[in-house]
Amino acid sequence: MLASIIGGIFLIKVAYANPLNLPSYALLKPQIKEAYSFAKLEGDKLQDLPCNCGCMSDASSHGGRLHSRGLLDCFIEGDLSNGGKWDSHASECGLCYEDALEAKKLYEQGKTKEEIKEILLEKYSKLKFSEDTVYEE
């Protein structure tokens, strides 16, 4: 009986701590959780925004599939309400989840999707990428 009560309390705490039913890897850091929450609740705002980590041109980053929807594909494969599933890529890629959070902030400031797209493209236009990190030229 006691184990049943403790188990029930645990389930309530887990459900309360994760009301959006995010995958466990999305809960690793508060910023990652915020980015995955944004992708789930307002994914249309990430659709067509550029992903600048290079994963859009390398299908191996996403289980063999190339991006078709931009930054949104770093978080979600397909439509979650219609058989889609989460993608773990953004939980492991600071560029992806940080750009999603930057986009969220810019939307909150009243920027349009086109303005945000330009800001993200400009942000990386003067940088070069290596296998390990981003360097300023």
Predicted regions, residues:
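Immediate flanking context of iron-sulfur cluster ligation sites
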Residues: 35-51, 78, 83-88
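Extracytoplasmic/periplasmic, Sec-exported soluble proteins
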Residues: 66, 88-96, 108
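Extracellular/mature segments of secreted proteins
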Residues: 59-74, 81-86, 102-104
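Acidic/histidine-rich, surface-exposed loop or edge segments in extracytoplasmic proteins
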Residues: 16-22, 76-87, 98-101
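Local cysteine-cluster metal-coordination motifs and their immediate loop/turn environment
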Residues: 47-61, 75, 90-98
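Secretory/periplasmic and organellar redox-cofactor proteins
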Residues: 1-46, 61, 104-137
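Residue-level marker of positions within ordered structural domains that often coincide
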Residues: 58, 79, 121
